[in-house]
Amino acid sequence: MRHREQLMAGAKQCLEERGYARTTSRDIAAAANAPLGTINYHYASKEALLNAALLEMLQEWGDKVRAQSAAGRRVESMWERVVESEATDRPLLVASAEALAQAERFPEIRQQIAEAFERSRTEMAADLHGIDATDSAEDKKLARAVGSVHMALVAGLTQQWLIDPEHAPSAREVAVGLRRIAEDLDPSGA
């Protein structure tokens, strides 16, 4: 494995073990068994490397929780996988929350996260609802709206699970709540 790949693997390990905020360049170099200077050579900065590693990990996480389910159960199945992952992938979700806090002060982090959010919106709309954002301008707007709602729910659910897992909602509670909200939003009252 070359230094670039070693650094990526080391950064992922550090994100899991130490989190985003507590990981130093020395931690990454030690985990990667690579010279300290190779971080700046290959990634320009520790933050750029951590961002790349975190975004890659989050993409893998998103792919896992959005895995296809039987028609009619896609959304509820995804929420079941999200809730399950809140416990099994806690270190990744903590690192993600730490990175979001850093975005306020580092424009490059903000830009990378914003681009990942935009991709996630359309992926969620396509995977869960069959909305193809490339079909028309109307579908692009719909995909953005539907994906944004799912992302808001994932973020809120993650915060609840990180702070108070004992009282955080189950997948079933999320589904029940969404159904009720949908009923209340139905203008026909049906």
Predicted features along the sequence, with ranges:
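Hydrophobic alpha-helical connector segments
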Residues: 48, 52, 63-93, 139-150, ...
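Amphipathic alpha-helical segments used for helix-helix packing
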Residues: 87-114
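Short, Lys/Arg-enriched anionic-surface-contact patches
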Residues: 2-3
